[in-house]
Amino acid sequence: MAVGLGPLPTLHPVAGFELGIASAGIKRPGRKDVVVMRCAEGSTVAGVFTLNAFCAAPVILAKQRVQGPVRYLLTNTGNANAGTGEPGLAAASRTCAKLAELTGVDASAVLPYSTGVIGEPLPVEKIEGALQAALDDLSVDNWAAAATGIMTTDTLPKGASRQFQHDGVTITVTGISKGAGMIRPNMATMLGYIATDAKVSREVLQNLLLDGANKSFNRITIDGDTSTNDCCMLIATGQAKLPEITKAEGPLFAALKQAVFEVCMEVAQAIVRDGEGATKFVTVEVNGGATYQECLDVGYTVAHSPLIKTALFASDPNWGRILAAVGRAGVPDLDVSKIDVFLGEVCIASRGARAASYTEAQGAAVMQQEEITIRIELGRGACSETIWTTDLSHEYVKINAEYRT
């Protein structure tokens, strides 16, 4: 059950970016599982990709091709085309070549994306057979349908949209994402597509996406497993009648950056809220670090601890598990006598020991909530980081035990 995640908000169309959805029946007959996205000619495209060494065939191709002109993005669900070797690369290339043939573009202008079961051959003929229907369905108004089309174990589609005015012109930023398990992006299985009608140089666009992803997609984790297929793309169609943004400065860039960051954050947190079997949305906030990296080390150690995650599921304020996780995070010369830990606003540990004012009833009251913040004060410096995660439930085990059956 998704935690605090409702129906999709209004997803504003982006001029110069169209989406079409069709059914290839890859995993289930009749399911719309192929999504084609068309970028206006002259669009700039940026991407961040999984750091998993076993990255999927479509990731390899997309990383190579994103440097050149991009006209189409082709996504299939139900099959990850990962762990498939050279035949997988050939299969991904074939689907791109077929789409290029149907649209009259160069095959290198088509970027492939896949999500689903790892290690199974990509059903190329099924995907090829669905491409014309997806092209016939292309529309700037198909964001919501595409958000559903890219889902796998997700229970709800995920999307966000922002608009702002600059010199009397409306700029739109809209994005969708998918993911519910195998989530610890490190640019899980996570796909994200964000488009804007602003005109942005590729260098500025790439850095904007890197910054946005590092503050959102790269700060979420459900199970600590980094997928073979993670991708997040940012497309700027340049259809808005405004000057090109060529430097990361000025009011237009600042407004665009804020909109992109807000969309990234909303769709990234939606992945956590819809985490497989999740009953809690958990914020792990680490303050007072000597470096940002040690804050991340502590945050991820807490967020990945099975003992903490199961305590969250049980609504059990077992604060000793949090202290143990902080202590094994590998922070050099950690002075535990300076550490304070909070559940919500309740101080559960002060100076490395149980807080004198703490009662079990206070902790239990916080743990009963659907949205919980664990705040850790290291007392070592001025650096801070925040991670978003979930609990670990019976349902998570069931979903993943039965995934291929």
UniProtKB/Swiss-Prot annotation:
It is found in: Cytoplasm. It comes from the Bacteria. The record marks A188, T189 as: Cleavage. Pathway: Amino-acid biosynthesis; L-arginine biosynthesis; L-ornithine and N-acetyl-L-glutamate from L-glutamate and N(2)-acetyl-L-ornithine (cyclic): step 1/1; Amino-acid biosynthesis; L-arginine biosynthesis; N(2)-acetyl-L-ornithine from L-glutamate: step 1/4. Heterotetramer of two alpha and two beta chains. PANTHER family: ARGININE BIOSYNTHESIS BIFUNCTIONAL PROTEIN ARGJ, ARGININE BIOSYNTHESIS BIFUNCTIONAL PROTEIN ARGJ, MITOCHONDRIAL. This is Arginine biosynthesis bifunctional protein ArgJ.
